[in-house]
Amino acid sequence: MVPGAAGWCCLVLWLPACVAAHGFRIHDYLYFQVLSPGDIRYIFTATPAKDFGGIFHTRYEQIHLVPAEPPEACGELSNGFFIQDQIALVERGGCSFLSKTRVVQEHGGRAVIISDNAVDNDSFYVEMIQDSTQRTADIPALFLLGRDGYMIRRSLEQHGLPWAIISIPVNVTSIPTFELLQPPWTFW
């Protein structure tokens, strides 16, 4: 009986390591916190692209989240200079998720957060997949609920700011539940 228990224990310890090593994702979430402007100082939930893009190898304590111009980021960006070495906030639509990610990567962005173009979407995450071309992208690509993207952009417009300051990724398991600052319009 003891060898059987040890075998099950090894399987339980081995399986998560195998899944992580092969990149299988089941309900994978990544969190980031807006530090400024203060009226949206919340922890937001995003989902990584399913089969393209990179991963975060480092935690950015303070990095700019720059809304792309034009918002759909399907071609040349008029504010591409500000996206270099920062993270771009892009809207869904007009071209594939991979195309948007490549545009941001070509402008030197460290990652892209693509928000749904349905601003009333406060609960449905879209699975971002490759567009069947042979192209690739190396930077992380995340999907954000439309309501969250809208609220971030609206706050920046109200304050006349060109970008938000965020911390990404955030380990929410180390934050006590009562300290998690969640957007009041989003269900967790």
Curated annotation (Swiss-Prot):
Sugar-modified residues: 171
Keywords tagged on the record: Glycoprotein, Secreted, Signal
Effect caused by changing residue 121 to Q: Does not affect glycosylation state. Abolishes N-glycosylation
Main location: secreted
Modified how: N-glycosylated; required for efficient secretion.
Record's subcellular location: Secreted
A Gene Ontology term for the protein's cellular component: extracellular region
Tissue/organ expression: Highly expressed in skeletal muscle, heart and liver. Expressed at intermediate level in kidney.
Signal peptide (from-to): 1-21
Domain PA: 83-163
General function of this protein: Plays a role in the modulation of physical activity and adiposity.
Name this protein carries in UniProt: Protease-associated domain-containing protein 1
Organism field: Homo sapiens
Gene: PRADC1
